[in-house]
Amino acid sequence: HGGFWRMGDRALWSHLAAGALARGHAVALPSYPLCPEARIAGITRSIARALPAMAAEVDGPVHLAGHSAGGHLALRMACPDVGLPGHLAARLAAILALSPLADLAPLLEMPMNADLRLDPAEARAESPVHHPAPDLPVLVEVGAEERPAFLDQALWLADAWPDTHLTIAAGRHHFDVIAPLSDPASPMLDRFLGP
C-alpha cells in the first residue's frame, strides 16, 4: 500500500482486490511497520518475510502489485539482495508498480526524511534503479496528471530496467491511477494477470 511508508494499512486499500478476486485469483494485502518507528530497509525485510507465508497458501504464479511506497516494495521483492527463497522467486510472474518510488535519493532533501530517516547509503540500497532488472515482466503505470516527481520516478525506472512496460495513463493522477485494479475487465489487469 501507499502512504510514503509513514501511514495507512491494508484496510484502506482492500477494495482494490475486487478485480483480481473476480478473475479467480487469491489476493493478500499485507500491512507493514511504518516510519518513523521502522526504517525503509526494515519495511522491505518485513514484506520479504511475509511474502513466503502468503505464497504458501496457494499454488501457481505470484503477481506482485503496489502503489507509491507499495510500488517500491513490490519492485524491491524482485531485487536479488532481498533474498527471496529460490522456490518463491521462481514463482514470481509479474510486478505491477503504480506510481512507484524507484530512486529514493531525492527524498534525502525532503522534510519527510525526518520520519524516513534515510541516509545516502540506505537510499541507494533501497532504490530499485540501483539493482539489476529482474527476469520477469515489470509493468509501471503512472498517471499523466501526476506531479512531475512521480513521472520522473517512472521514467528513471524504465531507463534503469529497459524491458519495463511503462504506461502513462491519460487523465489519471496519483490517487486514481489505482482505480482499474478493482475492475475485473480493466486493460491494466489484462496486462498484469493476462486475459
Segments (PLM) and residue ranges:
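Active-site glycine-rich loops that stabilize anionic/oxyanionic intermediates
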Residues: 1-6
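C-terminal catalytic histidine-bearing segment of alpha/beta-hydrolase fold enzymes
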Residues: 151, 155, 162-195
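Catalytic nucleophile-loop/oxyanion-hole region of alpha/beta-hydrolase
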Residues: 7-17, 28-61
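Primarily recognizes the serine-hydrolase "nucleophile elbow" in alpha/beta-hydrolase
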Residues: 49-112
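The feature captures the conserved acid-bearing segment of alpha/beta-hydrolase catalytic domains
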Residues: 94-109, 120-156
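Active-site catalytic pocket residues across diverse enzymes, especially alpha/beta-hydrolases
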Residues: 81-85, 161, 185
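Active-site loop/turn elements of alpha/beta-hydrolase fold enzymes
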Residues: 25, 32-34, 100, 169-171
